[in-house]
């Protein structure tokens, strides 16, 4: 049994996540965590709401509300939505907890005392109209690398490059649109130059990093790591703990990534020191799930912080980074109301349908697009015709024609043995894909088992065999039933509710991954059999989209984001 810390990128809670945010981090992490637990591993799965930083502060200023009130209300909503999506966090917390604040301040003081932090005066943008400094998302402009018109002061969300506000072309205040002036202020910097060689070694020698994470990180290292300011002039955030840093806060990205540690500290707060058995054990496997725009902070910044701290933290095993999920071929956009957000999705279909669809099209190696035409095809042809139909064919036949209990192994032919051997080989292939965090390929392989099963039933025709050779019919249905155990196991991480129903139908009360490898027990009574999934028509989809627009219109008049969420 191995020990794992699984973390999904902490969502900003200025709004609820959309489907692209979900598949890029939280849902993918949940599927992997569920798989590992099902295999019997020791898993701690944590995340939380990113409460600080400019997105919240900008929105709060524009609405005339206190940032803390705003963030806490949105945190409660997002936490509830994740429960409704069946996300199996061991702890979903937030970055304004006492545990996190104290941990971050102590962590950075240690880095400061180790000599990796220095101070420097610099010119920073200031809005004379709003009378505030403009760090990060308070300032926008054209990206100097890709030309994107709304790049932020800390990062371009289009190309993913980390930026400095001075690099922006035609910068302007994100609140009022005014051109900023530049003022001298003092900030505290993490000297990444001192850590560059060790970071390069970590990236180059890490066999687990996906190609996009390795390529982006090596590109940054090739350019040379520059010192990064870790303080801001924001009012909303964690107060910087350094001598003379009164009025400064820790830059949100430098403190949020430490949440993966502070969340484990909080989880085990009743057992002092237990968290160290996860984060300071070199045998622990630490895996993060992020979208590709978060790669620099998880593959460069967090390892740098852990090394600079020097207290024996285990470096992350890998960062499972996806490409982008598009909606009908275009990027999700709140302002253009383009896409589907996770509260809206649950008004349209149960979570297992969404979970299956999103994992089936997970953007592992390239950007992929959610389209309703594709969603219908996945639901109707794959979930129903391939998987659901095969399950129903096997179980209703055993229920109606074989007394409702698992038949004996019978007298198998070579064809029957070849079938179950093929099923086990496919299941092993799915297992390897899950182990490699190739979740899409794992699910596709589970579907292939069902397709093999449908072909097998058509070829063997047990309804005919039953009339002339009961032993051969038993052999066929015994192995068909066995194949359903592999499907149930393979679906358990992806569609937990449906998989739980399938295990009940199979008459198995204590399911496990290894159960799929075990020959069935003859005489096991089946549970109640019913169709696992249902089909949707094009008309139903049209009705869903119409309902979605009606719900959005009703919410458009609401002033505050927490009033606009569908619960």
From Swiss-Prot:
Its EC number is 6.1.1.10. Its cofactor is Zn(2+). The keyword Plastid does not apply. Keywords: Aminoacyl-tRNA synthetase, ATP-binding, Cytoplasm, Ligase, Metal-binding, Nucleotide-binding, Protein biosynthesis, Zinc. InterPro entries: Anticodon_Met (IPR041872), Met-tRNA_ligase_1 (IPR023458), Met-tRNA_synth (IPR014758), Methionyl/Leucyl_tRNA_Synth (IPR015413), MetRS_core (IPR033911), MetRS_Zn (IPR029038), Rossmann-like_a/b/a_fold (IPR014729), tRNAsynth_Ia_anticodon-bd (IPR009080). GO terms for molecular function: ATP binding; metal ion binding; methionine-tRNA ligase activity. One of its GO terms (cellular component) is aminoacyl-tRNA synthetase multienzyme complex. The keyword Zinc applies. It is an enzyme of class 6 (ligase). It comes from the Archaea. PANTHER family: METHIONINE--TRNA LIGASE, METHIONINE--TRNA LIGASE, CYTOPLASMIC. This is Methionine--tRNA ligase. The lineage of its organism: Archaea, Thermoproteota, Thermoprotei, Thermoproteales, Thermoproteaceae. The gene is metG.
């Amino acid at each position: 049994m191995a020990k794992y810390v699984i973390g999904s990128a902490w969502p900003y809670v200025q709004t609820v996540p959309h489907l692209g945010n979900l598949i890029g981090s939280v849902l993918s992490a949940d599927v992997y965590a569920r798989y590992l637990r099902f295999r019997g591993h020791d898993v701690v799965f944590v995340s939380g709401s990113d409460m600080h930083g400019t997105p919240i502060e900008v929105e709060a200023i524009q609405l005339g509300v206190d940032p803390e009130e705003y963030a806490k209300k949105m945190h409660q909503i997002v936490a509830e939505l994740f429960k409704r999506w069946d996300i199996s966090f061991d702890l979903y917390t937030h970055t304004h907890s006492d545990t996190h604040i104290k941990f971050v301040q102590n962590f950075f003081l240690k880095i400061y005392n180790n000599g990796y932090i220095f101070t420097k005066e610099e010119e920073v943008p200031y809005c004379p109209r709003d009378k505030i400094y403009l760090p990060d998302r308070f300032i926008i402009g054209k990206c100097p690398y890709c030309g994107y018109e709304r790049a932020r002061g800390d990062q371009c969300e289009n190309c993913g490059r980390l930026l400095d506000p001075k690099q922006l072309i035609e910068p302007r205040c994100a609140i009022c649109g005014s051109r900023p002036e530049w003022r001298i202020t003092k900030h505290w910097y993490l000297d990444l130059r001192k850590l560059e060689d060790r970071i390069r070694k970590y990236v180059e020698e890490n066999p687990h990093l996906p190609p996009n994470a390795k390529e982006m990180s090596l590109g940054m290292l090739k350019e040379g790591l520059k010192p990064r300011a870790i303080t801001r002039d924001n009012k909303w955030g964690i107060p910087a703990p350094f001598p003379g840093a009164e009025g400064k806060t820790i830059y949100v990205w430098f403190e949020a990534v430490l949440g993966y540690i502070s969340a484990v500290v909080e989880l085990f707060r009743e057992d002092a020191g237990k968290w160290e058995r996860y984060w300071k054990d070199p045998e622990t496997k630490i895996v993060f799930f992020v979208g590709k725009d978060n790669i620099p902070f998880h593959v460069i910044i967090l390892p740098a912080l852990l090394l600079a701290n020097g207290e024996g933290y285990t470096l992350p095993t890998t960062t499972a980074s996806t490409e982008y999920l598009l909606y009908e071929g275009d990027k999700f956009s709140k302002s253009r109301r383009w896409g589907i957000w996770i509260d809206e999705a649950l008004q349209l279909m149960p979570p297992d349908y969404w979970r299956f669809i999103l994992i089936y099209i997970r953007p592992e190696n390239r950007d992929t697009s959610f389209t309703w035409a594709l969603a219908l095809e996945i639901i109707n042809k794959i979930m129903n015709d391939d998987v659901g139909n095969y399950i129903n064919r096997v179980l209703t036949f055993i229920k109606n024609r074989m007394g409702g209990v698992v038949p004996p192994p019978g007298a198998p032919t070579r064809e029957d043995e070849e079938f179950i051997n093929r099923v086990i080989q496919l299941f092993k292939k799915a297992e390897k894909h899950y182990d490699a965090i190739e979740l899409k390929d794992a699910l596709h392989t589970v579907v292939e088992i069902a397709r093999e099963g449908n072909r097998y039933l058509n070829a063997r025709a047990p309804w005919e065999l039953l009339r002339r050779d009961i032993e051969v019919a038993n052999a066929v249905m015994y192995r068909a039933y066995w194949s359903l155990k592999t499907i149930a196991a393979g679906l358990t991480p992806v569609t937990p509710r449906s998989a739980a129903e399938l295990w009940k139908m199979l008459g198995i009360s204590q399911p496990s991954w290894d159960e799929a490898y075990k020959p069935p027990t003859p005489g096991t009574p089946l549970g109640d059999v019913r169709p696992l999934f249902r089909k949707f028509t094009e008309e139903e989809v049209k009705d869903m989209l119409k309902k979605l627009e009606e719900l959005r219109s009703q919410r458009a008049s609401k002033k505050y984001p927490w009033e606009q969420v569908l619960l």
